Amino acid sequence: NVVAQDAAGNSSPPATVTVDSSAPPAPVINPSNGVVISGTAEAGATVTLTDAGGNPIGQVTADGSGNWSFTPGTPLANGTVIVATATDPTGNTGPQAATTVDAVAPPAPVIDPSNGTTISGTAEAGAKVILTDGNGNPIGETTADGSGNWTFTPATPLANGTVVNAVAQDPAGNTGPQGSTTVDAVAPNTPVVNPSNGNLLNGTAEPGS
């Protein structure tokens, strides 16, 4: 508690302050493609951003929920290291956090042949796979696992001939080119089996079946 006393001996009501000597934790930096840098930190803390050489990128203040976001005047180049520290309102600065800009878009997803019941394929590991039809109408979204495999089951099987387009969006927000396939929900014709003496069975069927 602090009071003020004038020369005549009059004392003011006390003012109270609580000492804060604890540094905030390191900020969390979300994956970034260099266009926007965001994350979380102690609410009200000033987040200072520099590159690996200590050159300033910018400063921003975390809101009451601890969220912060900063947009550089020019997008940061792929591979730029971003270093962030948080300084609380009393001047305590916490440890550093760092991330590396990923500004490279993932490749187009591979879509396996589908009969419309399930759509599956491969994409960059961890990427969000966004599926639309040939007119751009949404079909659904899913995320590729650590091996790059993904699968999506529509609530209603897609009709024969439906065009399925897929793009992959990585955690940094980069969206790659489109992959595409067409639903084949028509069963093949009955195979033709040639006469056989039992030593060899052969015949004809739908190509690729």
Model-derived regions: residue spans:
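Ser/Thr-rich low-complexity repeats and stalk/linker segments
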Residues: 1-209
